[in-house]
């Protein structure tokens, strides 16, 4: 697919992804950051994976209901890839080309952690799917929120209340510990892009850590961005 070039004189938006295990606080922190960016007159939107576009939301319902698991790891991975392809080309890239910051709750790292590390899908398969679905699109910053497994699972249980756990929340402690380890390994393999933040702290402390990472790794590097650095 041929991508439209950004309009002349229009700065490309920044692409920030949030990753982490269940109950790590991604949704809370991504919305706090969006509010701060918009208050600073930087247009920002919040989106998510799986989902984020009409077609991808249909697939989200399918995989979180557990149907994807019944098809096997590789078929489930293809479902995630289909959702990502639609999301990238209908939401993420068009927004970035308009100078809008895109804050995404999960992206390709989640596939590498969940389907790669835990589903044993071969790296070569994941690499091939990424070439097709995202091409050269790479986050300007990936925030990995790290929280002890037991605490994350407790938070997830409180969040859903009397509702049933989704396909991934229902997994056992060992699964979630492997997931936490996978994210730490991803961060270690790409330290320029990824920052790990202790999400066991209170909401405001975590938010301050997220902002500091954005300030030091993205805002300072972008001389065109006029925003308070504190």
From Swiss-Prot:
Q: Which GO terms describe its molecular function?
A: ATP binding; dTMP kinase activity
Q: Does the keyword Protein biosynthesis apply?
A: no
**What's its catalytic activity?**
dTMP + ATP = dTDP + ADP
User: Which SUPFAM superfamilies does this one have?
Assistant: P-loop containing nucleoside triphosphate hydrolases
| UniProtKB keywords | ATP-binding, Kinase, Nucleotide biosynthesis, Nucleotide-binding, Transferase
One GO cellular-component annotation of the UniProt record comes to:
cytosol
Q: Does the keyword ATP-binding apply?
A: yes
Pfam families the UniProt entry points to: Thymidylate_kin
EC code(s) of this entry? 2.7.4.9
State the top-level EC class: transferase
Could you state one GO biological process linked to this protein?
A: dTTP biosynthetic process
Residues reported in the UniProt entry to bind ATP = 20-27
- Function of the molecule: Phosphorylation of dTMP to form dTDP in both de novo and salvage pathways of dTTP synthesis.
Name the NCBIfam families for this protein. Answer: DTMP_kinase (TIGR00041)
Family, per entry: Belongs to the thymidylate kinase family.
What is this protein identified as?
Thymidylate kinase
Organism listed in the record:
Nitrobacter hamburgensis (strain DSM 10229 / NCIMB 13809 / X14)
